[in-house]
């Protein structure tokens, strides 16, 4: 049960019972009505602006209209008190019985509490990471990997049909450079002294095993071939090896994609997919031949002072038209972007989300233009940009790069502080804001370390059940038993904790609609704070302790509350991709 959706429906029902509202119903926009927690919890449990947004079209005073609405709401047995505040806000306080039934609903739902049908099964493609397959993942890839993965988890929890995708950039000139770098390592494996790696090639030692595997499989045969013959062989082997490495790096971060889409497939069969995409835009009148004026600032790679085949992207929201085919007849990188979007659209996705680094800010408008042009405005495209992560150790900056060819890898960070610390902290700030990651702070066992604080709350919940089994030997209670015992919950401090749990479905839907998975991390910290605060109250107020070995009935009732807290923590942590431990040592 979603408390706020429930009371939104009740408020609208109350409005429909007012004669003046019924008379002017066609002129009223109920969509402007909000139902949310009041800013000050002392004002009540639910607040609505219904009187304020409807007063003007009804020709009424907001406070006067609020009084009429209040009279209707007072007829609801689940409303303990209702009042008007300020210019016309209506504050509602709920009955203890309502909170108890809501808690029972939470217990019965378990980890499905908060799950939503908001998405109604709409297909969403979330593409994230998509790092060039030229080496191991570095720390700069961490944030986009976590944000994209958590967003995909969040959307799935909110009822969307989600596919997680990785676009392999395996068709560009950097892959030729990578293959030449590996070929050098292959020659080294054959016994040749290669000396210092030439400038422009990839110097990393991670390429040595690839060269060795080629030497083991081909001997000197590749060495005797011209480049045009050995290049495709070395490319295939290298890309395969790099993707194995990248998948292992991502798995260490608990990131698993459903689809790995190769850019090379767009160029296969004479670039048939790209030609088809351009033909489609041509049919719609978006393609022409022309010469672009030089843009201000640094010239993009695909600009040239010659006639090219262009996408009329300014007609669909872009700042400038974009080259599709160069004057020499070759396709631009952007042309592959068009074909890739068309591929996603043809696969039936209603919405595509691209999670990119902040350095890709210039791509946003052109990608949005592609979406409008290819889908005729039917598909939605969103680009989320992730700002930089700065590494610190005890407040001192950590160099991102070490010596040439060596750098701080994603695996380095995960192995030092743990997967859960990396994932949760990468979400503990909005993706559009820079993030400071301090190795020392994320391993502290204190309130100042959010991941520890939240996981510790779940572990504490599990410890309560162990205490209960010690206090009452042979105790076995099911979720159904706990749900039936909620009548024992009624202390204001306990109801405050239930109220915090009741926010979860609303947070899930709001986070999914705004595509902001960090909201889940923030909520979990708030819930953990509420739970720890209630735990601490029990130290001084024995009547608030979760387990009272002299009162089995009240203990079981409170176990239900603990079960609900643990379930929401576990669900929220699962969305973030973080474990919910039963114990912490």
Swiss-Prot record:
Stored InterPro entries: aa-tRNA-synth_I_CS, Arg-tRNA-ligase, Arg-tRNA-synth_N, Arg-tRNA-synth_N_sf, ArgRS_core, DALR_anticod-bd, Rossmann-like_a/b/a_fold, tRNAsynth_Ia_anticodon-bd
Cysteines paired by S-S bonds: none
UniProt-listed CDD domains: ArgRS_core
A molecular function (GO) term: arginine-tRNA ligase activity
Gene3D superfamilies (UniProt xref): Arginyl tRNA synthetase N-terminal domain (3.30.1360.70), HUPs (3.40.50.620), Isoleucyl-tRNA Synthetase, Domain 1 (1.10.730.10)
Pfam family, one: tRNA-synt_1d
PANTHER family in UniProt: ARGININE--TRNA LIGASE, CYTOPLASMIC, ARGINYL-TRNA SYNTHETASE
The protein's assembly and partners: Monomer.
Name recorded for this polypeptide: Arginine--tRNA ligase
Gene: argS
